[in-house]
Amino acid sequence: MKFFALFIYRPVATILLSVAITLCGILGFRMLPVAPLPQVDFPVIMVSASLPGASPETMASSVATPLERSLGRIAGVSEMTSSSSLGSTRIILQFDFDRDINGAARDVQAAINAAQSLLPSGMPSRPTYRKANPSDAPIMILTLTSDTYSQGELYDFASTQLAPTISQIDGVGDVDVGGSSLPAVRVGLNPQALFNQGVSLDDVRTAISNANVRKPQGALEDDTHRWQIQTNDELKTAAEYQPLIIHYNNGGAVRLGDVATVTDSVQDVRNAGMTNAKPAILLMIRKLPEANIIQTVDSIRARLPELQSTIPAAIDLQIAQDRSPTIRASLEEVEQTLIISVALVILVVFLFLRSGRATIIPAVAVPVSLIGTFAAMYLCGFSLNNLSLMALTIATGFVVDDAIVVLENIARHLEAGMKPLQAALQGTREVGFTVLSMSLSLVAVFLPLLLMGGLPGRLLREFAVTLSVAIGISLLVSLTLTPMMCGWMLKASKPREQKRLRGFGRMLVALQQGYGKSLKWVLNHTRLVGAVLLGTIALNIWLYISIPKTFFPEQDTGVLMGGIQADQSISFQAMRGKLQDFMKIIRDDPAVDNVTGFTGGSRVNSGMMFITLKPRGERSETAQQIIDRLRKKLAKEPGANLFLMAVQDIRVGGRQANASYQYTLLSDDLAALREWEPKIRKKLATLPELADVNSDQEDNGAEMNLIYDRDTMARLGIDVQAANSLLNNAFGQRQISTIYQPMNQYKVVMEVDPRYTQDISALEKMFVINNEGKAIPLSYFAKWQPANAPLSVNHQGLSAASTISFNLPTGKSLSDASAAIDRAMTQLGVPSTVRGSFAGTAQVFQETMNSQVILIIAAIATVYIVLGILYESYVHPLTILSTLPSAGVGALLALELFNAPFSLIALIGIMLLIGIVKKNAIMMVDFALEAQRHGNLTPQEAIFQACLLRFRPIMMTTLAALFGALPLVLSGGDGSELRQPLGITIVGGLVMSQLLTLYTTPVVYLFFDRLRLRFSRKPKQAVTE
């Protein structure tokens, strides 16, 4: 009591304390970063290695495997996957959440160094690594276009000047430049001319390499001067290479231009990028795992004018895609929802108390509690994101509850004629323990969330802490500022003030009287109510089992990502045409604002597209509806598929898949994997629960298989190394020399001119110079035949792997899809040598599914322990927790009604309901126990009186919580997919709970009281407990 009096009788100190809390909150708010969601990115590092011309199988066995064995020893690696394609290998390392990305990078570099001696000697460069997840959608895409400069020149500007500068910006993890390659001098050989001159491809390669060297020449020096020696030992352009003498034939010089076409071109001609309908170079910017997306984007935008000034005016630098506008719009929507919730909650207080003065008190208490929370958020390193702001929105109903309970009880004493300061002190003393019980038991709900590990735990931690801090500050405010304001501001109601809103007052009195009559009947028919309570428990179990489930609500971020998968034998020219066709279909859609895409590189039959949709206010369809509409149009394109998916703020795993969810097949028997993967993929493609089923296993690429006759080769004086070198020189885009420039290094690339490689007859024109100097055609010692070969070889860990990706059709949930896949695998009878498991987001969903029930039980157990400690009773906590089944039924039924799957957001709603609905029971039980102790009432009389006396605050707190959550249900615009499931769950649970717990709680109270008396050896002490 002295604690309350300290603040009630010292108003200046109390006001200044509240002002201090508010000012700290304002400062914290101004310094908080902005993000779509809490920081939940796994630390991911990508290792890249190249060996131009090497087959996928060669890359897997000679490059990927040695690196994997070394990288697999690094501590904290949770998943390691690799993909080897023509001439390149990429290994993705995903680390545990608590692994520092910089420390992991040092370990990765050490592992690469340790494996260096096991790698092929012909690799043009050492393996490199990047601290970025290639499967993440870029946070920003810049494009370079020009009517004057070539694609190679644009790529040079992008990779030499722009990308390094952008990479240095805080938060940027990787800048991937696509759409072309660096400038190069290309030597296109004429096989017939070479044969006529008696010049081998190795002769050409050696001559070019020897003619373009960069070696130190030293200096001349005398007693007084020093002269640096400089020679014309380097060739820079195609014009300088053209007259190069490579051979003498019968005394005549054979120049490079006589046997080849030499051009200034690009290093790899099999690359193409586009923005809308125009060729473009793309700079795809990804952030570091720990970076804030908004801060990173703002930093990049601030540097754009400087970047534009470093490139010629004829080059147009544009932002093709930016993830930040929809994030900002989503957060603005949440902020508006928060403001509406505060206004509605204050309106509820005004309607019940019918006093402007009384309404001012919670109108002050609520902002102080919410604003003060920002200071704690800043100190904890949190951000302003959808979840933390939703926590504050929901907290509106909670923080006003404490003020309402105190205010309503003080107002009741004032109506009885007590003086304001005395009423404030007496009223606060009576409900102080109640408010403490309500707040502590509510915070206890979130303790299991704070201890939860993995991605769900990291995702929900900010929500739980933010809400807990708001409740803690609210508890302090309701026991200090609220009673002080009541004591100094409230007065006895005047008659004319009592008439104000008399219609609502009469309705409330009528409701209370009706409730009293119905409660008397219920207390005389307790068995029926008990049966209803048991029925709700059973209904909870059935609804939870049957309701569709997913990991996280499908977001509409305004950005789509598409993966193109074409026939495995398609040429680059045909693939570029497919890219243009797909881009035209998408560009013509009325909901699309911008589209960029690229194809080429080591995977000729694949490509990527990034689509920016118009803002939500300018389109009527959701991202998923747009995908459904485009899917029908895209299906008409023969020879290729474009798989679209909406970019999400949460994406788990490092696989660059063509769909949102993955199912991975593993086997130590590669033949078994290649046999069963097509069967499983075809079966899954028939399931109605899955859409866009595709696989990264591509085993049917066209291959020309050459078979050497080793006996003939030995007789003719030819070895296998010379024959393989011939093929690499002719068809491998072999980099044979380096051109050094001040800003970069460029390559001289040699191959047979594409005009002479249009069909299989190109092999017949190839020849080798043997050890006697004779030209021996390839057909003399080799035969060839067409065959199939893999376009890529994939590993997970050290096992062969194949990943099947899929999206969800409209109306289907991830639980539907996972159950269907499990059934399909059982029906197919897949052998034990082939193991299947979900990967990425689908894997996290499976893990979360297994822990959801345990989490809910843990929350209930924690609340029980806290209540048991507060009440010093085993029984009364059970009475209070009996309110939960009805809330669960209401929440699950509401989700079913709105066709919303049970997700992580809905789980948060269930956890909140555990804390919310027990408040009603706490108020009833507290007053009933008080009446039994001091009023000498029977248990039935005590609980009946408690229900009637607490009817008004119960209605107020419930409606405050309901109206605080209602804007979440009704909100639209950006980010509503996250807000609505939370609002639906809470509103549904509150409505059902309010209808039932007003009757079930008194019945359960009496039941346990009788049970306690029956088993108690000291009934009298039990009554006065």
UniProtKB/Swiss-Prot annotation:
Subunit structure and binding partners: Part of a tripartite efflux system composed of MdtA, MdtB and MdtC. MdtC forms a heteromultimer with MdtB.
Disulfide bonds: none
Gene name for this UniProt entry: mdtC
GO cellular component, one term: plasma membrane
SUPFAM superfamilies: Multidrug efflux transporter AcrB pore domain, PN1, PN2, PC1 and PC2 subdomains (SSF82693), Multidrug efflux transporter AcrB TolC docking domain, DN and DC subdomains (SSF82714), Multidrug efflux transporter AcrB transmembrane domain (SSF82866)
Membrane topology: Multi-pass membrane protein
Family affiliation: Belongs to the resistance-nodulation-cell division (RND) (TC 2.A.6) family. MdtC subfamily.
Localisation: Cell inner membrane
Molecular function as annotated in GO: xenobiotic transmembrane transporter activity
Keyword Protein biosynthesis listed: no
Protein name, per record: Multidrug resistance protein MdtC
The entry's keywords: Cell inner membrane, Cell membrane, Membrane, Transmembrane, Transmembrane helix, Transport
Superkingdom of origin organism: Bacteria
Function: The MdtABC tripartite complex confers resistance against novobiocin and deoxycholate.
Membrane-traversing stretches: 3-23, 333-353, 360-380, 387-407, 431-451, 463-483, 528-548, 853-873, 875-895, 897-917, 953-973, 984-1004
